[in-house]
């Protein structure tokens, strides 16, 4: 899982063109923080190993990680998550260990540009998962952005939302509270 050399070369080229274009505009653009991404915004070893790091003090690497996938993203019947389930915690640990090894430990900032867990009528498991996930991210200084699709119960394919944009109400205030309290 992770792409091929052609896709790695393409994203590296686009990242370089992007950074060089913004920097070439002059003024304060040389100090502007810019986010580059990995192939598919992925976090596998193959993907992270093939990202060309741009020598620029204001570049941030943006990735996405819905992990463990069968709990967080897939529409499977996997609805429970527990800190005592080593395969589930290992999935999260592995992602953050790779991000630390490739970037954080080298002074390269990372942002988790997308993460979330699908609503499967499993709020207590989602909260346990979120607490563990955020603890790992915060320990490395990685800010996380919850992927709110704007869709909820009416669309089973993308039930990651925590805010109802029609009624302007929080669907899962407990998730919002944890997002805020863990990242202060």
Language model features by range: what are they?
Residues 1-86, 97-117, 139-140:
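Active-site region of glycoside hydrolase catalytic domains
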Residues 39-45, 90, 118-127, 152-154:
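Acidic-and-aromatic substrate-binding clefts and catalytic sites of carbohydrate-active enzymes
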Residues 122-184:
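Aromatic-rich peripheral "rim/lid" segments of glycoside hydrolase catalytic domains that contact
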């Amino acid at each position: 899982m992770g792409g091929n050399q052609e896709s790695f070369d393409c994203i590296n080229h686009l990242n370089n063109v992007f950074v060089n274009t913004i920097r070439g505009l002059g003024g304060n653009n040389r100090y502007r923080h810019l986010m580059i991404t990995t192939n598919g915004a992925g976090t596998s070893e193959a993907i992270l190993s093939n990202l060309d790091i741009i020598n620029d003090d204001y570049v941030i690497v943006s990735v996405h990680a819905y992990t463990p996938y069968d709990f967080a993203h897939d529409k499977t019947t996997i609805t429970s998550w527990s800190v005592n389930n080593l395969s589930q915690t290992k999935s999260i640990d592995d992602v953050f260990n790779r991000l630390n090894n490739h970037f954080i430990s080298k002074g390269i900032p990372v942002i988790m540009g997308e993460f979330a867990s699908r609503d499967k009528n499993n709020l207590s498991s989602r909260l346990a998962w979120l607490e563990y996930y955020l603890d790992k991210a915060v320990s490395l200084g990685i800010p996380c952005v919850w992927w709110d699709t704007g869709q909820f119960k009416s669309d089973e394919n993308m039930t990651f939302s925590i805010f109802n944009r029609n009624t302007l109400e929080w669907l899962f205030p407990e998730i919002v509270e944890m997002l805020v309290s863990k990242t202060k």
